[in-house]
């Protein structure tokens, strides 16, 4: 497999590199059990149990164990999903620290509690339904020897019903709040807030946007004729799937390009305290805001030299798909990395941010 980063959309060069072999990481269907219970007006307790006969190291990133205000559960009211106000983060998936994992012995359980009013708009009150589903990356071993992802554990929790007191829910402080945009400091490159940038950060971000636009445009052009690759990543080659892929990638390319003023605001540095350990960048989808974190600049190459490797360009592309002004409905984090993303169903893959980044990386 080759990585072909085609920059012809913006009149640049073509970079080609040989891909490294992708290790097998099987999806374990029912190794863990998750039970939800209500412990207050909007407080939820999740009990995670290892049903298997081997110890598990469960990666916390973008799962129900995540300590950051990411999407841990789905909340519905009258059949419609309640607005999510938290952050959608892209994490660095190499060099993982043991601190990022929760270890569960066979048949053991761990509890995680969180207030869904901190990451959802529940100010209307009334009856809601809460559930959780997804996959948790797993590693074998303990400590520093147990940080290499070797599999993925699928889960689907029970559903619980809550009758939310609107006044109490409104009194809960939102985890991410509202960002105050700086007037007079906007660069017409997807509205970069230059007041948050050093020159080196601005140069890196502009380069990432340039490459994001080129990769997205090249992938959009390739999708209708590269059906085997579309099927590999999106699990469908229907006309509707192809049209959705092309439309969304073209939208990302347009938003990333130099000549657009853009609908998103991009910050070079953290403005909402979302840059916790392991976070490369994050998006506030309800505000159409993207923020880069320090390790975006220090730990990522501008463009990857192998397939499925994280870089600045595809991280920016990934984050673009989280914004409702770019992709509607915006994409979520349903599967992370090649093995996890390609285990999704067609319906999930088309809504998964990393699927677009991975597809663009190899198109």
From Swiss-Prot:
GO MF, one example: metal ion binding
Localization terms from the record: Secreted
InterPro entries per record: Fungal_M35_metalloproteases, MetalloPept_cat_dom_sf, Peptidase_M35
Catalytic activity entry: Preferential cleavage of bonds with hydrophobic residues in P1'. Also 3-Asn-|-Gln-4 and 8-Gly-|-Ser-9 bonds in insulin B chain
Predominant location category: secreted
Gene Ontology cellular-component terms listed: extracellular region
Keywords, comma-separated and alphabetical: Cleavage on pair of basic residues, Disulfide bond, Hydrolase, Metal-binding, Metalloprotease, Protease, Secreted, Signal, Virulence, Zinc, Zymogen
Disulfide cross-links: 197-268, 275-293
Co-factor(s): Zn(2+)
Classification via Gene3D superfamilies: 2.60.40.2970, Collagenase (Catalytic Domain)
Signal peptide (UniProt feature, chain positions): 1-19
Annotated propeptide span(s): 20-189
Binding site for Zn(2+): 318, 322, 333
Keyword Chloroplast: no
Cofactor note: Binds 1 zinc ion per subunit.
Keyword Disulfide bond appears in the UniProt entry: yes
EC number, as in UniProt: 3.4.24.39
Location of the active site: 319
UniProt record, GO biological process: proteolysis
Family statement: Belongs to the peptidase M35 family.
Functional note: Probable secreted metalloprotease that shows high activities on basic nuclear substrates such as histone and protamine. May be involved in virulence.
Protein name (Swiss-Prot/TrEMBL): Probable neutral protease 2 homolog MCYG_01991
Organism of provenance: Arthroderma otae (strain ATCC MYA-4605 / CBS 113480)
